[in-house]
């Protein structure tokens, strides 16, 4: 345990723009605070070799030790961590303000500052963010969005499944499922962008797409390697860890722009690109939003899909449940997988004004970290929290009555409030369709399941490639 706590100390470092002081006005106690290591000690620990891959475990142990709200200092930055379900809900519903601020990784901010690369919604703040987010809300989150999104998703996944069928007539082992699902997620987003027309075809386009998805994967991996290191120093001395990160971002943006140019050559499209044009969004802003939209899609949806197949392989009775109950059961499977393995194990906000969090007064500008991984596995909120039990989400399932605790908003994989995930309907449609088509068409199992553990690499991902044995059913 001490080793994990030491490791976590190296993992988090936040940009100076988020630095603040936190004061409390509680009559009896102050906010529990983790003991700070001397600055030199932190850097020595960092050099010894922690890359933040067990950050979710470190913070979970902190909560076990200090409670559901505690403060920790990383460098010169005070951060407030919360795992109380009601406090998390209040943060998103009542405290985040009209223009919610959130924490971005230091390397991403430095890259944008150094190279002047204006980015999409994730990087926007204030009125600029709100104006563009309102447009995206209208197009992607209204009730009628499900229809046109579902058509694009189903078309793409059907093609993907046919490819797997062709490969696995006599059984195969897919050694790197993550890369295939990354590629699929990117294709889904592109189909959503163009609508009812076909995407570009040919070897050149396929190679471009593969290179792009691989470069995006590398962004997240190289970002994690920069955790806890003074990024300005890495840049100033041109250290390899910075070079690797910069090369990945350079390549991803270059290839993303090339992909966008290929997509824009398509005539008579009916998808998101046309809809954004109909909203009079200017071309530069549209390009920024679309490229970041494509980049974000791969990591989040791909790894959620991967965790679902892993969990189904380890709980084969749930495959039978899906085949029996079909589409009605799949949303419960998705919710339960995201409770156990939220792709974003931490959600962040910057307080826009002095606020009361729990019983404590917290100053404007304070970074607050919602520990979603911890809240989702808390027995106070979910009975048998370590077990994969999709039926816990089904109000009509008699087995649910045996589970005493069930607080749905303790698991918020898409967050809440104004800055919640704008692509959640696309993600849910993709996950539901992919699960159904895979379960319906294949017998599958994860052949290295017992050795799989979650690690933090920006997202919560498996610690090694998941190897999936796949065979067409009744073949």
What are these regions (language model features)?
Residues 61, 444, 458-475:
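C-terminal helix/juxtamembrane-tail motif
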Residues 44-67, 254, 258-262, 324-360, ...:
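Conserved cytochrome P450 K-helix E-x-x-R motif and the immediately C-terminal K′/meander segment
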Residues 396-431, 454-457:
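Cytochrome P450 heme-thiolate "Cys pocket" and heme-binding signature region
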Residues 101-113, 147-305:
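Cytochrome P450 heme-thiolate monooxygenase catalytic core
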Residues 2-115, 130-131, 154-159, 410:
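N-terminal membrane-proximal hinge/A-helix region immediately C-terminal to the signal-anchor transmembrane segment
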Residues 424-461:
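Cytochrome P450 heme-binding "Cys pocket" and the immediately downstream C-terminal segment
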Residues 370-401:
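Conserved cytochrome P450 K-helix/beta-meander segment immediately N-terminal to the heme-binding cysteine loop
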Residues 300-319, 323, 425-440:
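Cytochrome P450 catalytic-core helices
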């Amino acid at each position: 345990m001490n080793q994990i706590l030491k490791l976590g100390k190296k993992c988090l470092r936040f940009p100076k723009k988020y630095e603040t002081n936190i004061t409390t006005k509680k009559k009896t106690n102050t906010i529990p605070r983790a003991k700070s290591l001397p600055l030199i000690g932190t850097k020595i620990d960092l050099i010894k070799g922690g890359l933040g891959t067990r950050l979710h475990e470190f913070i979970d142990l902190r909560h076990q030790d200090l409670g559901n709200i505690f403060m920790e200092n990383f460098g010169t930055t005070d951060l407030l961590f919360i795992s109380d379900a009601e406090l998390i809900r209040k943060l998103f519903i009542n405290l985040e303000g009209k223009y919610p601020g959130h924490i971005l990784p230091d390397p991403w901010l430095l890259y944008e500052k150094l190279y002047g690369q204006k980015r999409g919604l994730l990087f926007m703040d204030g009125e600029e963010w709100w104006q563009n987010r309102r447009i995206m809300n209208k197009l992607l989150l209204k009730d009628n969005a499900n229809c046109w999104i579902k058509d694009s998703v189903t078309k793409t996944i059907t093609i993907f499944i046919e490819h797997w069928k062709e490969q696995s007539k006599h059984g195969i082992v897919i050694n790197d499922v993550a890369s295939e699902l990354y590629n699929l997620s990117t294709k889904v987003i592109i189909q959503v962008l163009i609508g009812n027309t076909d995407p570009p075809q040919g070897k050149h386009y396929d190679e471009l797409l593969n290179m792009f998805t691989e470069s995006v994967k590398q962004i997240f991996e190289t970002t994690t390697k920069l955790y806890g290191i003074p990024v300005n120093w890495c840049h100033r001395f041109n250290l390899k860890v910075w070079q690797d990160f910069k090369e990945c971002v350079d390549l991803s943006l270059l290839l993303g722009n090339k992909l966008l140019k290929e997509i824009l050559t398509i005539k008579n499209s009916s998808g998101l690109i046309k809809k954004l044009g109909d909203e009079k969004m200017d071309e530069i802003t549209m390009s920024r939003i679309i490229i970041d939209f494509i980049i974000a899609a791969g990591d989040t949806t791909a790894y959620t899909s991967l965790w679902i197949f892993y969990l189904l392989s380890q709980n084969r009775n749930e495959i039978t449940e899906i085949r029996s109950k079909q589409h009605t059961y799949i949303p419960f499977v998705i919710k339960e997988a995201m409770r156990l393995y939220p792709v974003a194990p931490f959600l962040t906000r910057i307080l826009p004004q002095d606020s009361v969090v729990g019983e404590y007064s917290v100053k404007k500008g304070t970074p607050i970290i919602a520990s979603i991984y911890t809240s989702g596995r808390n027995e106070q909120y979910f009975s048998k929290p370590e077990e994969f039990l999709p039926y816990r989400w089904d109000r009509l399932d008699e087995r649910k009555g045996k589970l005493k605790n069930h607080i749905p908003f303790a698991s918020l994989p898409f967050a809440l409030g104004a800055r919640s995930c704008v692509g959640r309907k696309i993600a849910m449609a993709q996950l539901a369709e992919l699960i159904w088509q895979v379960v319906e068409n294949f017998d599958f199992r994860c052949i290295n399941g017992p050795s799989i553990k979650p690690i933090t690499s920006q997202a919560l991902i498996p610690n090694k490639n998941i190897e999936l044995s796949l065979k067409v059913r009744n073949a």
